[in-house]
Every structure is written in structure tokens, then in C-alpha cells.
Amino acid sequence: MQIPNYLRVVANVFVLLSLAMAGRPGFARDKYETIDAQAYGTGTQLGQNIGVTLNIYEFSTPADKQVLVQAYQQGQNKGLVNALRKMRAVGHVEITGTLGYDCSYIRVFPTATGRKIVFATNRQITMAEAWTDSNSMSFDLTAGILELNDQDKSKSTGSLYPAAQLVLDKEGELQMDLLQNPWRLSSLLDWKGTAGLN
């Protein structure tokens, strides 16, 4: 009994795709670092809390920072947002109640007790905001700071800025302008990734 030609072609394509997928880094990747936190509302959001997860594929480089600085100098907040949109994802932010979104910029800085992680990405604009052309659409960044204490995990803290934009203050310094108040991050759990990568 002979096998029809189209079945041979399908079988060969299947084998080739399987081999190609096995060699892709996405299928044979190292373990990512994951940081879970509980975000507590402050000010007008007092009493509310949500879960926040930051998955770190890799950290951004000083060259990435320079690209963002130049983009801000040329186009202010809109320039920064456009530059973030063009950058590849270095992580993923998940906030309870959302599907989550790719994170374009994550930097790590050593501290006396551990590490400081700063992240920023474009905020997803909701359908209601777009429909009503809300003022909140100009706050198109989500950012955060995580202060990880490796000596005493209970002292790890941070801040989440769910809707923000960068502006220059009266002294010409960059500052974060928020739509509402920052959220306080606590109960941070750091699930270390593959050593040396993230």
C-alpha cells in the first residue's frame, strides 16, 4: 500500500516544524524571575488592594535607558511612550483584573541590602477611556519601583504608579505626574530566575 504524496508532504512539514520549535529559545528558555506583590491603595483608593506580578525575562541595558532619555528630550512624554512602544518586551506586568501587558523597560540597581528594580511600560487604555476621550488617556504610562531586601524579606517594599506621565517641574527636574495616588506594594515574593540571566 502506497502513502499518498500529500500525506508525505504533511508529515515532512510536521517533522520540520517540530524540529524548528524545539530549537527556539522560547521553547527551551531559562526560568524567568517573578516578583509577586500586594498593592494597597492610598489616598482616594484607601482600602482597596490588588495583586501585582512582574515577570522579568531580562533586564534593560544602559543603551535602552539612553534611547528613552533621547526620546523624552525630543518628544516629552509622547516621545517616551512611542519609544517604549517600539522596544521589545523584557518582561510582563500582570495586575489583578487585567490580562496583563508586556513591560518594555526594567532596570536593576544594587543597594546596601539587596536590589532596587525600576520598571516602566505603556498603560493599556480602556475602551471606556477611548470612547469618552477621557483626560486620563494622557496618563499613558505604568511604572513601579521595587525595593527588594535580601537580608530581611519582610522589609521589601515598593510603589506602583498605574496611570502616570513624565513632566518637568518648575526647577526643570523630571517627575512623575499621577492620575491618582501611587499604590503601596508590600508582601513581595521574589521567585529567582536562572542565575546570571535575571
Model-derived features: where do they sit?
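N-terminal secretory signal peptides that target proteins for export/translocation
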Residues: 1-7
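Sec/Tat signal peptide C-region and signal peptidase I cleavage site
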Residues: 24-28
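Long, low-hydrophobicity ectodomains and other hydrophilic envelope-associated domains
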Residues: 30-198
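Bacterial N-terminal signal peptides
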Residues: 10-22
